[in-house]
Amino acid sequence: MTDPARAAGPGPTAAALEGDDAAWEAFLAGSAAPSHLQSAAWAAVKRPNGWRAFRVAAEVGDRIVGAQVLVQRPRGVPWGMGYLGRGPVTADGALDRAAILAITARLRTAGRAHRLGYVRMEPELEAGDGRIARELSRASWHRAPHVQPDRTLLLDLAQDEAALLAGMHRKTRQSVAKSERLGVRIVDADGSRMSEFYAIHTDAMTRAGISPRSQRTYQDMWDLLAPRGMARLLFAEATDTGEAIATLLLVCCGRRVVDLYGGTTAEGGRRRANYLLKWEAIRRCKAAGFTEYDLWGLPREGIEQFKSGFGGRQVDYVGAWDLTISPVGKRLLDLGAAGRERYRRWRYRDVHDPADPHGRRAAAAGEATPPADDGS
């Protein structure tokens, strides 16, 4: 991945952010909380799966607030749904009442123009004392089921390596060292090894009860993000056989790296390869100049225990919120979504081991957080 540093320059206009990909990407990368879900590159990743994107921006005094909205239109429904992941975006990461009202007005106007039933938003904001939630409610947003993880761990890569190690749990440090003794090495890879990544990742997802995506989806993701310096693929290999026994696909935006997808084989679990792999990912991202490492969610008991071993600050987000554009359209879209979820649960009804309800075996093997349905 490329160095996240950006040169300072004159501020963009709202019109430029809405219509110019380069201006938007620069604004996003330089913001206090850049997320790949808000990048034009991510919109390109989503396009083959039927998603389209538009952006809105508004000037609030001497500040600008902007957002990228991904749009999906289910077959047979004259309304689409909009998804605003980890936004809106502001230079300082703050979102006050004026900014919320301004972006809400722009989303209403654009939502009607794009014939949306509703827009679901998951701000990159902490729940805190509830102030943001109150302001969103006053602006006619309503709480909704979250799509992305509603809590995560953020590692501060501005610390030196000794401080990062000190912040890890003792058993995690021991597992990292043991993995090295058991004969594990970490290597960077390119897109030619995506089939190996896919085999490990999908096996992990299936064991965790998550519907795997197609290999083409991940290959497209790599092909679109890697040339922009937004993706990095790592493998843990057994030093004696050369076999790939664990993998991670990292995605970056601005100064932040997200630990997005991964998996571990049974042999990788035996050698604790997931511990060494994650530690090396952290070290290499720090060396590349990134300042924040997002472990991307704490969704299940076993996964939470594994991830929290690496330290970091727990962040609890304000959650997901819906803005209704068309009441009829939203009702139809909600009914369709409920039907698809029932089918998904039926299809994967036999995947979970009843004796392992929290996925502890999968977590022990070091699987990455299951991806959200819409954000990837």
Predicted feature residues:
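A conserved beta-strand-loop-helix scaffold within acyl/acetyltransferase catalytic domains
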Residues: 15-61, 65-77, 123-128, 133-150, ...
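Aromatic (often tryptophan-rich) hydrophobic motifs at membrane interfaces
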Residues: 101-109, 219-334
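Flexible glycine-rich active-site/ligand-binding loops centered on an Asp-His dyad
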Residues: 84
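Residues at the N-termini of beta-strands
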Residues: 81, 116-118, 256, 292
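A gly/proline- and charged-residue-enriched helix-loop-helix capping module
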Residues: 88-135
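Active-site/acyl-donor-binding loops of N-acyltransferases
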Residues: 2-12, 17-21, 31, 44-45, ...
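Short, high-confidence coil segments that cap the C-terminus of an alpha-helix
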Residues: 51-53, 113-116, 231, 288-290
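Short catalytic-loop micro-motif centered on adjacent basic/acidic residues
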Residues: 118-120, 187, 291-295
